[in-house]
Each structure stands twice: as structure tokens, then as C-alpha cells.
Amino acid sequence: MKQLVTFEVQDGENEYRDYGIYDHKYSDEEIIKHFYGLDNIDEENGWYWKDTSIVRINNAEDIDRDKIKIMKDYGVAYEHNI
């Protein structure tokens, strides 16, 4: 089973969320590096620096194939393989 990962991003006063679908076997750091295309990231109190923004995994919950299809159909989240 895969997991729906919710990223929380803070960029100055702006806050937003991104979504991705990953296998359970990856760490938060690996997922963040892959999703944002980063080679090296610095961690501070559970947040990771991405240029001038900070990002963390806010939530990760199991998702089944039917829900994955719905997320893809609506362009909300896609499956990622590291």
C-alpha cells in the first residue's frame, strides 16, 4: 500500500500544501529531496530548507488504488518512485 504525503510549505508570509504519493519505505528527508529535486537539505526542528522556504511532511496516510486514481484524475497528486 502507498501513502498520500502532505507537504506543508512556508515561504515568508505565504503558506501552502503540496501532495505526493510514495511507498512507505522512504524517510521524510528522502521524500522531500525527491519531491522538490534537492540534492542537499538542512533540517531545523523538523523543517527542511528549500531555497528561501521551509517545508515539512505534515501528514502521511495510507491510500488505496481507487483513491490514487481519483487524485491523479483531478491532478491533485501523482505517484513518485525514488
Predicted feature locations:
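Short aromatic-glycine-(Arg/Gly/Cys) micro-motifs in beta-strand/loop hairpins
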Residues: 2-15
